[in-house]
Every structure is written in structure tokens, then in C-alpha cells.
């Protein structure tokens, strides 16, 4: 079994690589490889797409690696490889992003990425730090994760899904903030599982052993 963390120069993958390698060892889930090569994505059994920064910049960066975006599309939509998007990697699952400019996403989960607008003016944007999760819909990747568990967020925009059934969990930050999305063989987290201690490691382990 091979899990590929896609490296397209949009964030430091060191902590994510360590967390995935640790949980792959603990669960017997095989090898974890960080790669920017389309051929590695093509042979992967599972794909993880991280991303830090602004949606348009990450989308352009991914597109600048010849064949990489296409390899992800092929693996996820045509060959149904399990996929996990993290932070901007999750946002790119949307129809479009509205950060700075309108930018098309993969369009795998209907909805758009919009700026967080807390109802409480004392709540600062970006949403940064620990927050509680509220589980909206059960999912194998959420096994052992309950409402009230903590996750670590750093973001100014969030994914407004078109269909409630595809929002698996949310957080409260003066408004409902989408925390986890999912459909078919794909899931995404707005928070960073590799920085979310027990909750994040549980989610990573669940993803690595998920058999959709």
C-alpha cells in the first residue's frame, strides 16, 4: 500500500509526513511518500493533498507542475482512489474559491470558498488556534472522533457546501465553519490533522485504513 502526499511547494510538509508515517506504521498501512511526480500519484493507493496560503496561489502552483493536477483528477474521479485534502487542499475540492479573485476548484463537492464572517466583531480573522468540532454526519474517517473533540485551525476562508450531507463536521467561530467534508472516496479537513494531536492522529489512522 502506498500513500502519496502531494508536494507542489505550497507549505512545509515535514510535520504532515511525520504524522502520516507514524500512523502508517501503527496501522500497518504501508509506505508514505512525499512526491511531486504525476507517475507516483498514478500508482498511489491513497492520495493526500495539503496546502497552505491563498486559494488562487495554491491552485496555480499545483497547475504549474506538469500533469500533476491531471494525475490527481484521474486517480480520484476515475479510479476512485481514497483522497484527503488538508486546509487549502480541502478547499480546492470546491466548485470555486473567492479569495482575492474567482478561481475554479476541482468541483468534486459543490460549493464555494468564502471569507469567514463571524457575527461577533471581537472574533478576529484569520481563525487561528484550537476549536471544538461538532460532528454533523457519521463517516468511517470520523470513527472515534466525537463532538467536542479539538482540532487546530489556521484560515481566513472556509468551504460553504451546497449540500448539507457533504458537510461531515463543523466548528463554531461566530458562525458555522465547515471543518470536514466528504463524498464517495474523498474527504477533506479545513483544520490541520498533523497539528491536532489525538484527534488529528485518529483521523489520519482512519483515513489510512478506510476501505470505501
Swiss-Prot record:
Intracellular or extracellular location(s): Cytoplasm
Positions of the catalytic residues: 87, 192, 194
Pathway where this protein functions: Amino-acid biosynthesis; L-histidine biosynthesis; L-histidine from 5-phospho-alpha-D-ribose 1-diphosphate: step 5/9
Record-annotated Glutamine amidotransferase type-1 domain positions: 2-212
PROSITE patterns membership: GATASE_TYPE_1
Keyword Amino-acid biosynthesis recorded: yes
Assigned EC number: 4.3.2.10, 3.5.1.2
InterPro entries recorded: Class_I_gatase-like, GATASE, Imidazole-glycPsynth_HisH
Single Gene Ontology BP annotation: L-histidine biosynthetic process
Keyword annotations: Amino-acid biosynthesis, Cytoplasm, Glutamine amidotransferase, Histidine biosynthesis, Hydrolase, Lyase
Catalytic reaction equation(s): 5-[(5-phospho-1-deoxy-D-ribulos-1-ylimino)methylamino]-1-(5-phospho-beta-D-ribosyl)imidazole-4-carboxamide + L-glutamine = D-erythro-1-(imidazol-4-yl)glycerol 3-phosphate + 5-amino-1-(5-phospho-beta-D-ribosyl)imidazole-4-carboxamide + L-glutamate + H(+); L-glutamine + H2O = L-glutamate + NH4(+)
Chief localisation class: cytoplasm
GO cellular component: cytoplasm
Molecular function per GO: glutaminase activity; imidazoleglycerol-phosphate synthase activity; lyase activity
Its biological purpose: IGPS catalyzes the conversion of PRFAR and glutamine to IGP, AICAR and glutamate. The HisH subunit catalyzes the hydrolysis of glutamine to glutamate and ammonia as part of the synthesis of IGP and AICAR. The resulting ammonia molecule is channeled to the active site of HisF.
SUBUNIT field: Heterodimer of HisH and HisF.
NCBIfam families: IMP_synth_hisH
Entry protein name: Imidazole glycerol phosphate synthase subunit HisH
Originating species: Cereibacter sphaeroides (strain ATCC 17023 / DSM 158 / JCM 6121 / CCUG 31486 / LMG 2827 / NBRC 12203 / NCIMB 8253 / ATH 2.4.1.)
Amino acid at each position: 500500500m502506498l500513500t502519496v502526499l502531494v508536494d507542489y511547494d505550497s507549505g512545509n510538509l515535514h510535520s504532515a509526513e511525520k504524522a502520516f508515517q507514524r500512523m502508517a506504521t501503527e496501522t500497518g498501512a504501508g509506505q508514505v511518500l512525499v512526491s511531486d511526480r504525476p507517475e507516483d500519484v498514478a500508482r498511489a493507493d491513497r492520495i493526500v493533498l495539503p496546502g497552505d496560503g491563498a486559494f488562487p496561489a495554491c491552485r496555480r502552483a499545483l497547475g504549474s507542475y506538469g500533469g500533476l493536477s491531471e494525475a490527481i483528477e484521474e486517480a480520484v474521479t476515475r479510479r476512485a482512489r481514497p483522497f484527503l485534502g488538508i486546509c487549502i487542499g480541502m478547499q480546492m475540492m470546491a466548485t470555486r474559491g473567492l479569495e482575492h479573485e474567482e478561481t475554479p476548484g476541482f468541483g468534486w463537492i459543490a460549493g464555494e470558498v468564502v471569507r469567514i464572517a463571524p457575527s461577533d466583531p471581537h472574533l478576529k480573522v484569520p481563525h487561528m488556534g484550537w476549536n471544538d468540532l461538532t460532528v454533523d454526519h457519521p463517516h468511517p474517517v470520523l470513527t472515534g472522533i466525537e463532538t467536542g473533540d479539538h482540532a487546530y485551525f489556521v484560515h481566513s476562508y472556509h468551504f460553504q457546501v451546497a449540500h448539507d450531507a457533504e458537510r461531515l463536521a463543523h466548528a463554531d467561530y461566530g458562525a458555522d465553519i465547515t471543518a470536514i467534508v466528504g463524498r464517495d472516496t474523498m474527504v477533506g479537513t479545513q483544520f490541520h490533522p498533523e497539528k491536532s494531536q489525538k484527534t488529528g492522529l485518529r483521523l489520519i489512522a482512519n483515513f489510512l485504513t478506510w476501505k470505501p
